[in-house]
Amino acid sequence: RGNWHNEAESACMILAKSCHDTDMLQWLVGKKCTKVQSFGTLSYFTEKNAPEGAPEYCIQGCPAAENCMYNAVKMYVDDHTYLRWIKPDIPHDELTEEIARDVITNTDYGRCVFRCNNDVVDHQTLNMLFGDDVTVTFTMNAFNNGGRYIHIMGTKGEIRAALNETTPITVHTFADNKNEQIPIV
């Protein structure tokens, strides 16, 4: 739902939601990407998976509202965490129930996720080949707890990071089998 459910109205999902991720990969590798292979599908956010009796908008009395993970009332009215992304011009502490109800009543953010005319993938994997035979696999997936994670595997060790403000980067070196935690500052 929202701005990116339909390619004709926005862009393909990898461009709309993950172009900065692929830019970061290019920067980290420091080489030109020479080949790309991609697989992706829209398998879940489709009309056929809509709960029985689900209306066009969640606020219109959906019979599945109580147990729906994507209930717009829960996501935007009851908890303003995601609302701040939709209304970035309004300070988080000034987001009100009235603003949230307006969003879910009058924008695509209030539509049932299964009834949004979705035509973009809900998961996609890219296999990329860079110069010097560096290979990268990137996965964009709607079915997770949110966030960005990176795992770099090299000949001398590996690096793992959750790209947020609180989780340290972990560097593991094979020679001494040690982990180093690098705080995010």
Task: Cite the ranges covered by each PLM segment.
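Glycine-enriched catalytic-core subsegment of oxygenase/oxidase enzymes
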Residues: G110-V185
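Predominantly a Rossmann-like dinucleotide-binding segment in NAD(P)-dependent oxidoreductases
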Residues: R1-G110
